[in-house]
Amino acid sequence: VLNARIRKAWSRGANIGLIGEAVDLTYEYTHMGNGRADLQSLLKQKFTDMLTLPSLMIVGQAALQGEDGASVLGAVMELCTKTESKLLVLHSAASRVGLMDLGCTTEGGVDAAVTGADVVYNLGVDEMDIAPGAFVIYQGSHGDRGAHRADVILPGATYTEENGLFVNTEGRPQLAQRAGFAPGQAKENWAILRALSAELGATLPYDSLAQLRQALVTDVPHFAQIDQVPSNEWVAVTAGKLGKGDFGVAISDYYLSNPIARASTLMAELSANAKARATTPMAAE
């Protein structure tokens, strides 16, 4: 969806530049390099032409996942300041921005959160390995890797089977309406957590989705600003020493990038076809 928006801007005359692996974006762009050295070189240039036009810099997860991720982000923010550009961080998980708004983060990341834990309550996280030893409770919809590691599975609705409030990659809250009902014994995810809290003797203070949303908006007021991008304070990250090497790509198989896609026969076929095209040599005309 985002790439379609970028293509639309390109069709209207926007100039696109890319630092990273050269890929087919379906539109023309200037390939400005592959990695950290090219970003460092870009910081030394002058940007007189860019100052006269509105511009946006998008930084993806492949650039931020290394040990120098904070330094890379700092360098990009410095570049934004020099060019008077806006900044957008492109996330690879649909729920990540909303969870960060809620404060669901751990110093040291996921590894710090699960290391040494006796019990892990996994809310649909499938792109990670949980070490043996912990008792795992998995709440999710499609029986992916997280469910295979679980000791207890609580089947939840997928995003099309329940009303939801999502925050997109730019921080814009969006309402999603249920398109169908969850199969079998699967329940809406908020209802699972509410029922579990009662069983544990720590009943959560809401009995309906409306009450839950009221509590949510009280804690995070901008969640009430549906379809609006909140104004964020610019807090620069110090551009530390960058490492070496190229950025690469964050998603190696587009068609199998999430649990719902991996449960799809059609997506598996598309993935296989894409791999076949990549490995089959083209005949010379």
PLM feature spans:
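Long, low-complexity segments enriched in small/aliphatic residues
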Residues: 210-285
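Non-catalytic alpha/beta scaffold blocks inside enzyme catalytic domains
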Residues: 1-226, 280-285
